Amino acid sequence: MCLPTIRKIAIIGAGPSGLVTAKALLAEKAFDQVTLFERRGSPGGVWNYTSTLSNKLPVPSTNPILTTEPIVGPAALPVYPSPLYRDLQTNTPIELMGYCDQSFKPQTLQFPHRHTIQEYQRIYAQPLLPFIKLATDVLDIEKKDGSWVVTYKGTKAGSPISKDIFDAVSICNGHYEVPYIPNIKGLDEYAKAVPGSVLHSSLFREPELFVGESVLVVGGASSANDLVRHLTPVAKHPIYQSLLGGGDIQNESLQQVPEITKFDPTTREIYLKGGKVLSNIDRVIYCTGYLYSVPFPSLAKLKSPETKLIDDGSHVHNVYQHIFYIPDPTLAFVGLALHVVPFPTSQAQAAFLARVWSGRLKLPSKEEQLKWQDELMFSLSGANNMYHSLDYPKDATYINKLHDWCKQATPVLEEEFPSPYWGEKERSIRENMWSIRAKFFGIEPPK
């Protein structure tokens, strides 16, 4: 597939995926303009920790078009909340976590604190600052007369609305903006009856707020297990953890229970699959992930099966290799992949994207791209929320496949932007990552 000549590129988001995409594109030396739009006041995306919380999250939360409202404070610029909590440490060891063109500083912890990653991102962003429009919110992205019209506005009060024209747009806004809380019978009334009794992990900041409270954590992924670890020293025992199919851990501090079937807002009882009932629960914390969101009206209104990007938020539709919009590959995404090591995966995607948009690599035909999508959907057997899931060893295969494609780009540049490759060492660390983490933190690895 041949693409039109691309000279001006917009990147939406200056977080981890947006920054590495900008570096990859600039390294091609093939474009007249590369502009990043970032609504926060500094680059780094969600790694910009905010202690202030938003109080506008609906319960349940199932709308992928939900827009994140800034927190209005005394500062000159509004603050967009981050899902990070105060004591967060990464769930990925530094041997895998970083970009392959920037090492962590010596003596960095194997599983660094959030502020270490924020500083890592700050250093990585430094040479890109002239290309970033900070404190700038993108309102819409629309294809008109063969070009992409990006409508944007400064986040400072009184800023005018502006428009600019681009040949291509890479959406790098991540997938940690719209929390998902499933709609379970009685949940709405239960949450309204006692405000603050139901929250999402994105609103968790510090365990001291849960001292002596009876807590039910919903979910079994890394965020849920991490919150259980932080709550264990302070919360009332046992902490309950609701898992699909239940769980094996039953001890004084933690009891794993089946999924929730109903909330009773009058008695404050929580009914579980199999008949068990929990009572006197002070807080329910949903660690149920996030919805994919494309919060731009002109793109969100695309509804036909051949053109739509979003419907229920389970995944982004019509994207080849989790990157290129099949109907028009001058629109792309970096950072959609789930259950991966984010930085190297985004770097692999960015390296591939840059070589395609510069014309040094060609995409397969539209028919082949659609065939790839159809085969992936068929393999999921209806589990659409796993569309972007690349858990090990899929992520290693994906990263190396993109690396191999990048090696085929012609002509070869004197200084090629690096595409990561995972050899035996990286694969071994990735395969054993959870046991490595459990040993580091002194906890029982998840079953």
Swiss-Prot record:
GO terms for molecular function: FAD binding; N,N-dimethylaniline monooxygenase activity; NADP binding. FAD binds at G13, A14, G15, P16, S17, E38, V46, W47, N91, T92, D137, V138. Its cofactor is FAD. It is an enzyme of class 1 (oxidoreductase). One of its GO terms (cellular component) is endoplasmic reticulum membrane. Keywords: FAD, Flavoprotein, Monooxygenase, NADP, Oxidoreductase. The keyword NADP applies. Its EC number is 1.14.13.-. The keyword NADP applies. NADP(+) binds at T90, N91, S223, A224, N225, D226. InterPro entries: FAD/NAD-bd_sf, Flavin_mOase, Flavin_mOase-like, FMO-like. GO terms for biological process: cellular detoxification. It comes from the Eukaryota. Transmembrane segments: none annotated. Monomer. Belongs to the FMO family. Flavin-dependent oxidation of thiol-containing compounds. Probably required for the correct folding of disulfide-bonded proteins. This is Thiol-specific monooxygenase. It comes from Schizosaccharomyces pombe (strain 972 / ATCC 24843).
